[in-house]
């Protein structure tokens, strides 16, 4: 059961990109053919918020067809009795190529293809009996998505990705106020 939870949490981390994301866009006063020029998009992943994982993303357009998306996640929840721990420090970058006619759309709206890489450290203990701690995890893959403007400074993004995740972890159990190492292993996931 604990291994299933561990796999589920890692799967959730990898595929939370399938969420709708609220995007706040700063746009310049200049417009070309009724489109505004996006200078910077500040974003938040709503699925991470539902999982109590504070996060922020910044997307920077690079020319008409390209953009760079940088994200950071940092849930750091634990109790003092060694009964619960939900800690993740993660960052990643994604290069995006925007498809379609860029003359009739904003620079960060419509369909896109992307390639991402991310990494971080984690410690998950959902039950007192066992937990999993990793000094690192690394993931990389490709994405497809669509951004739909809702208002002048608001849009929603949907994306789906497939990739590879690699991590070395230590399984532990809590004994009083101490954590006792039980075993260690490697985990590889494609999905």
What are the residue ranges of the model-derived segments?
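Transmembrane beta-strands of outer-membrane beta-barrel pores
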Residues: 46-50, 72-78, 92, 97-99, ...
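Residues that define the transmembrane beta-barrel architecture of outer-membrane proteins
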Residues: 36-40, 50-52, 85-91, 109, ...
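Predominantly the C-terminal beta-signal and adjacent terminal strand-loop region
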Residues: 151-191
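Short glycine/proline- and aromatic-enriched beta-strand/turn motifs that initiate or cap beta-hairpins
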Residues: 24-77, 82-90
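Short loop/turn motifs that connect adjacent beta-strands in outer-membrane beta-barrel proteins
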Residues: 27-38, 65, 100-110, 150-156
């Amino acid at each position: 059961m604990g291994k299933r939870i561990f796999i589920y949490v890692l799967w959730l981390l990898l595929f939370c990109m399938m969420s709708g994301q609220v995007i706040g866009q700063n746009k310049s006063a200049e417009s070309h053919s009724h489109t505004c020029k996006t200078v910077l998009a500040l974003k938040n992943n709503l699925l991470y918020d539902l999982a109590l994982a504070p996060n922020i993303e910044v997307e920077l357009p690079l020319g008409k067809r390209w953009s760079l998306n940088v994200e950071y996640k940092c849930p750091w929840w634990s109790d003092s009795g060694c009964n619960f721990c939900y800690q993740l420090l993660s960052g990643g970058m994604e290069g995006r190529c925007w498809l379609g006619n860029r003359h009739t759309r904003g620079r960060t709206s419509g369909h896109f293809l992307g390639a991402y890489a991310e990494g971080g450290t984690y410690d998950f203990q959902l039950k007192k009996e066992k937990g999993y701690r990793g000094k690192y995890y690394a993931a990389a893959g490709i994405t497809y998505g669509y951004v739909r403007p809702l208002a002048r400074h608001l849009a929603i993004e949907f994306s789906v990705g497939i990739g590879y995740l690699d991590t070395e972890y230590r399984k532990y159990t809590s004994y009083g106020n101490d954590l006792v190492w039980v075993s260690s292993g490697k985990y590889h996931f494609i999905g």
